[in-house]
Amino acid sequence: LVLIAVERHQLIINPRGWRPSNRHAYVGIAVIWVLAVASSLPFLIYQVLTDEPFQNVTLDAFKDKYVCFDKFPSDSHRLSYTTLLLVLQYFGPLCFIFICYFKIYIRLKRRNNMMD
């Protein structure tokens, strides 16, 4: 969505300037994938597979079942990581998209006023 907002912003704000190409799209997609994998690495590193929650259960349906848990070194590490994810994966793109579309809105409003 961020890349779509950037493309729309560029085409409306600077129509004769930079135009995104297929190569730009592929580079943008590759960067997004690298960032997604990098931001998920702590989950991969701190995952623990255990049958601990099912050890005291007597139901046959839960025997031999396993669960993945996040086992960060401390609660402050987990809190810092999840807060960073929230900021980088939600608020960052949301603000960026908002700014792009706000600039588009201002430009289109000015064009409309010029035509009136």
From Swiss-Prot:
Annotated Gene Ontology cellular component terms: neuron projection; plasma membrane
MF terms (GO), sorted A to Z: neuropeptide binding; neuropeptide receptor activity
InterPro entries tied to this protein: GPCR_Rhodpsn, GPCR_Rhodpsn_7TM
Membrane topology value: Multi-pass membrane protein
Superkingdom of the organism of origin: Eukaryota
Glycosylation sites: N56
Regions of this protein lying in the Cytoplasmic compartment: 7-24, 103-116
Record localization: Cell membrane
Family of the protein in this entry: Belongs to the G-protein coupled receptor 1 family.
Function of the protein: Receptor for neuropeptide Y and peptide YY.
Protein name (database record): Neuropeptide Y receptor type 1
Source lineage: Eukaryota, Metazoa, Chordata, Craniata, Vertebrata
